[in-house]
Amino acid sequence: YKFGIHDQYRDYYHAAPSYDENYACRLPDRTIPGHSYWAGGPQSYLCATQAPFYVKRNFAELKKNGIRLDGAYLDVFTCNEGDECANPEHVMTRRDCYTYRGNCFSWLLSQGILSSSEEVSDWAVPYLVFCHYAPYDFMLRPAETPKKGIPVPLFNLVYHDCVIEPWMMDHVSKDEDYMLYALLAGGAPYLVRDGAYPNTDGAFDGEKISLEEMTERCRVVTELHEKT
């Protein structure tokens, strides 16, 4: 097994001891956008100009304490658009934001840590070893929801050799088994995929599969993935 952690350098929670609104993204009118949607409570967004510092600080501390990582998942960097910041002390364009996010991934790789993030975006392909997933749009909706259009497997096949993409393996209904899409794309399987929140990110109740059966299904997909 490989050992990695789930980490985050965008959601900037006000309850954090290190929170400083001067490092939060500002709009041109000098207001600081934010919300309280996630479990961490009120938050704004950390300006990505600051992210490399915190990545290096935190991972250096982990190493100092004897924690050796094989991989790290920097959440949301690749599934959210680039941020902008109008703070005159650290002005940032969206292009700049992608560069700073890329610097975080590059630093991980320089330390021998496999880099990962939520989905895949074209700007991030040079920096990622694997991702959380890259599902088709309909996989993020309940199984009975009508499909919209025809999915184009850009990252799943065109960039197949560039990024390892774990696939959902849910048997969502008697007529739909996502394992078949994993086989079709020669992708990697997801053995256990628990959503952080109910009914979000494709984490719906479907056909229940035992761990033993899911392990066997994953073995089949893995054997094909190793050949592609």
Go through each PLM region and give its residues.
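Substrate-binding/active-site clefts of carbohydrate-active enzymes
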Residues: 2-53, 137
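Active-site-proximal substrate-binding groove within the catalytic cores of carbohydrate-active enzymes
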Residues: 34, 38, 46-70, 78-228
